[in-house]
């Protein structure tokens, strides 16, 4: 067989399409399919080295009197939002939650769920969110897979939680 050289028809400064330039693994965290919607600048921009709690607080220090969200007539300012996050973070710490702990939250996206996510991020814990409509077996599998030690659950999910909690490493359940 004769040796040969392959020449590309693309100019040397042209980059290949990100979608076609690598093999698809099937893992979103590796394949990053969302990048196809990003500009090159946005896709390669370095992320800030801070928690999303700190990022949100730093980027809204001049917006403290503006509304952060409205939910069924309930409005709150950034100042009150960050105060609620701080109180929730202190409460989690008082319960024994510490940096690196995984806290599962089985609740829809209520304002309280958002506050809990930010509070856990503030203290360095990891929020693992589960849809409360998930069946008991899947909740059990998820709790065991991530080795969650704490569980916050919507009260209507308690019957499901109660049926599986002894099969997990969860040491504290809080129903709201």
Indicate where each model-derived feature is located:
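Flexible, non-catalytic linker and terminal segments flanking ANL/adenylate-forming cores
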Residues: 1-49
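Conserved AMP-binding/adenylate-forming core of the ANL superfamily
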Residues: 46, 65-110, 114-118, 135-140, ...
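Short acidic/polar active-site loop segments enriched in Thr and Asp
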Residues: 98, 149, 171
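Structural motif
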Residues: 104, 150-154, 174
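Short beta-strand elements of ligand-binding domains
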Residues: 107, 130-131, 171-176
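Structured binding elements
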Residues: 124
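Conserved ATP-dependent adenylate/AMP-binding module captured primarily in the ANL superfamily
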Residues: 132-168
């Amino acid at each position: 067989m004769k040796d040969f050289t392959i020449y590309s028809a693309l100019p040397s400064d042209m980059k290949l399409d990100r979608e076609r330039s690598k093999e698809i693994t099937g893992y979103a965290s590796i394949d990053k399919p969302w990048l196809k919607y990003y500009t090159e600048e946005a896709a390669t921009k370095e992320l800030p080295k801070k928690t999303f709690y700190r990022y949100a607080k730093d980027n809204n220090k001049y917006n403290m009197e503006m509304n952060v969200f409205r939910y069924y007539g309930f409005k709150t300012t950034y100042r009150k939002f960050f105060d609620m996050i701080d109180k929730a973070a202190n409460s989690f710490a008082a319960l024994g939650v510490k940096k690196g702990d995984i806290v599962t939250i089985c609740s829809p996206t209520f304002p309280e769920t958002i506050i809990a996510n930010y509070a856990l991020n503030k203290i360095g814990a990891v929020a693992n969110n589960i849809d409360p409509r998930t069946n008991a077996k899947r909740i059990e599998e998820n709790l065991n897979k991530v080795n969650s030690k704490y569980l916050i659950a919507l009260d209507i999910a308690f019957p499901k939680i109660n049926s599986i909690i002894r099969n997990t490493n969860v040491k504290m359940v809080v129903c709201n």
